[in-house]
């Protein structure tokens, strides 16, 4: 008797992740998922009510990968905040399709998990700089918008700078904001 191949929800999410990473989310559909998994589309629809539900779960799956990535120290940065901002850019450079998927083409709003992650960063800024929470939030938003602009230019192939040059810009922006908020 032939052994039945079991396609799990996790297998399907991994396949979706790989399709986006390698080809972009415009190639993400049930047929391409089935092809990647070497099966029919039936296991996909057995695991997910529809492709919208799959897409929403895949966004969370990719976000978990992103959180793990930016939490690692890829750049030997001592400041948790600069580590995060630099890793955000590094993620965009290393995984442009995944970056686009979760930050540019994602119809789902910020999650509770993202809010917690951001709150931790803001708290660290507040503690390190001696800022109020409101000032730390402004500091975060100003530098994040700056970094996001650079990341978007990277993934859209508008900007092709070396990572060291980008990191220098981020550091200068960081120092400028520290000076600005110190004087307030």
Locate each region found by the language model.
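Basic, helix-initiating cap at the start of DNA-binding domains
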Residues: 1-23, 27, 31-32, 53
């Amino acid at each position: 008797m032939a052994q039945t191949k079991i396609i799990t929800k996790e297998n399907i999410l991994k396949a979706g992740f790989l399709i986006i990473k390698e080809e972009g989310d415009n190639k993400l559909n049930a047929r391409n998922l089935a092809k990647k998994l070497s099966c029919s589309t039936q296991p996909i629809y057995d695991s997910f009510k529809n492709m919208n539900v799959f897409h929403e779960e895949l966004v969370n799956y990719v976000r978990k990968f992103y959180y793990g990535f930016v939490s690692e120290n890829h750049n030997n940065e001592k400041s948790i905040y600069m580590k995060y901002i630099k890793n955000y850019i590094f993620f965009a450079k290393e995984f442009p399709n995944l970056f686009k998927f979760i930050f540019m083409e994602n119809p789902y709003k910020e999650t509770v998990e993202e809010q917690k992650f951001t709150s931790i960063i803001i708290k660290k800024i507040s503690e390190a700089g001696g800022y109020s929470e409101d000032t730390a939030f402004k500091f975060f938003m100003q530098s994040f918008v700056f970094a996001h602009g650079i990341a978007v230019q990277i993934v859209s192939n508008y900007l092709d700078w070396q990572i060291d040059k980008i990191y220098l810009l981020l550091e200068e922006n960081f120092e400028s904001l520290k000076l600005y908020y110190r004087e307030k």
